[in-house]
Amino acid sequence: MRIGHGFDVHAFGGEGPIIIGGVRIPYEKGLLAHSDGDVALHALTDALLGAAALGDIGKLFPDTDPAFKGADSRELLREAWRRIQAKGYTLGNVDVTIIAQAPKMLPHIPQMRVFIAEDLGCHMDDVNVKATTTEKLGFTGRGEGIACEAVALLMKAAK
């Protein structure tokens, strides 16, 4: 078994909506990013890549490459997952924690789980997504941005 951890953060800027966990969420502010700014899928992709010792999302999809400008993070996740599977890994489970004062994530979490399960080709029971605030402390608490942490468990596929 191998465990990976991922973290991502994006500052608010411009106009919304925002995309978190593949879900378009109405909000007056957008997120500043080279891609679509999906902190949940970026953190998850990093966790998966880390567990497989394949580096991180920035190595695989550099923000200096114009090809990834405005990229759909679901596509990035699927490509990373293909590479991980090619190394002989299967998924144990993933757990994602979104850290944001606003907007409220709870109504959107079921669809996030559906999208992640679809992208990883796994059961919904293997995907957990939750959200929390920092009780108005720090940059997320002041409404300056959104952060996310994720962990992933991989196993070598049976031969």
Swiss-Prot record:
Cofactor note: Binds 1 divalent metal cation per subunit.
Gene3D superfamilies (UniProt xref): 2-C-methyl-D-erythritol 2,4-cyclodiphosphate synthase (3.30.1330.50)
Annotated GO MF terms: 2-C-methyl-D-erythritol 2,4-cyclodiphosphate synthase activity; metal ion binding
InterPro entries on file: MECDP_synthase, MECDP_synthase_CS, MECDP_synthase_sf
Co-factor(s): a divalent metal cation
Site location (Transition state stabilizer): H34, T133
Reactions the enzyme catalyzes: 4-CDP-2-C-methyl-D-erythritol 2-phosphate = 2-C-methyl-D-erythritol 2,4-cyclic diphosphate + CMP
GO BP: isopentenyl diphosphate biosynthetic process, methylerythritol 4-phosphate pathway; terpenoid biosynthetic process
Record carries keyword Signal: no
Binding site for 4-CDP-2-C-methyl-D-erythritol 2-phosphate: 8-10, 34-35, 56-58, 61-65, 100-106, 132-135, 139, 142
Pathway given in the UniProt record: Isoprenoid biosynthesis; isopentenyl diphosphate biosynthesis via DXP pathway; isopentenyl diphosphate from 1-deoxy-D-xylulose 5-phosphate: step 4/6
Keywords associated with the record: Isoprene biosynthesis, Lyase, Metal-binding
Membrane-spanning ranges: none
Binding site for a divalent metal cation: D8, H10, H42
Enzyme class of the recorded protein, top EC level: lyase
PROSITE patterns linked to this entry: ISPF (PS01350)
EC number assigned by the record: 4.6.1.12
Subunit structure: Homotrimer.
Family: Belongs to the IspF family.
Function summary: Involved in the biosynthesis of isopentenyl diphosphate (IPP) and dimethylallyl diphosphate (DMAPP), two major building blocks of isoprenoid compounds. Catalyzes the conversion of 4-diphosphocytidyl-2-C-methyl-D-erythritol 2-phosphate (CDP-ME2P) to 2-C-methyl-D-erythritol 2,4-cyclodiphosphate (ME-CPP) with a corresponding release of cytidine 5-monophosphate (CMP).
The protein's name in its UniProt record: 2-C-methyl-D-erythritol 2,4-cyclodiphosphate synthase
Lineage, highest ranks first: Bacteria, Pseudomonadati, Pseudomonadota, Gammaproteobacteria, Enterobacterales
Gene (UniProt): ispF
